[in-house]
């Protein structure tokens, strides 16, 4: 009876304009822009586009980080983002030899670069994307920010190297095998973590924008779903994953992806050789010491963009506004209630009520397995329309599929002259309504209340309902036999289901 379900709930994104403002305020992008504006003819870079060591102090000073012991590292990180996002263009050192100006020699270039020789340093110019910072559309800003996110993601999955010289071979190349680093595995791990954090954020009943404890996030990547009490070995893996994530979220926070409260360093010292393993029971204050993280609105946008690029179906509230009623009703079929209403309200805002009502009613027809839920959502959408929709609703009073919901709408809106429904329409609507709720996979107790309310309202319900010409009659009666809390009524439902199937 159920149609294909979306793998992820819909996300409510901020507008592009709001997200663009958030992107421009991200600390790392702010630093990258500042360095791009600072860079000039005397700026020298290495073969990989990195600032030469001698220029890092000046770059740190531009960022106001001259007195910070990590200032040069922050400057180097911001410069990489400036290069990778096109805020600056790097000109390869080899290109310098093509200059026609005899005074534009490698030696003069190297004077500013310190230990680098002229033949080893390149130059930079302002990149085309620098102008987008002040003159670009929101979509341009977000594209630039996504490029920065890619750079930071790569940094977060890169191995920590304490002594790079020890990894450089005699031929000058880095021995990556000695790092014991699996780049694909590292990227897959972080993708999985961000995916789980995204799901926790958008799921109904999730943290509703609140922070997620780092132990819970680490456990979601390590502890098997069918495991009861985690073993010591698994807890050790959770501890290792927490430490790994602590480093990665510290790297991801400056680009504006997450808000992160790091693991308490004092806790790491307290734990000593055992690692920062959370105890079995701890209060709310204890949990925060193990790290707390949440995706920002910009982070939701960024993670969703990566998922879309990977080919996943990642719905967002509002993306159905320009589509037809059939796409709307199919699209929101398994949305959480609040998201379905928000999507519907947005869809209705762009249409006159009479036209919207006609389109919704036309899309609600059908005998396919998803039709009952489409009709339920059509009825809920119609309930948001005023009296302007009445002519369209009255036009389907005699329709065997829509006549019942039309009468419900008219009654709810206090209309006069509502014709009494034929008895078969009453039972057909009951079957259709239960079929829709079964497909929706809603709260079981609410469904039981609905079933018992419908059966109690009509005398001889099971003596009549099995004759209803509805594709889901037998399935609905079988479900009623399972769910009805009154045993005699449940038995009647099962008998009626047998009759419906025997009738063919």
Please give the residue ranges for each predicted region.
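Alpha-solenoid HEAT/Armadillo-like helical repeat scaffolds in large eukaryotic proteins
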Residues: 263, 319-320, 327-335, 359-369, ...
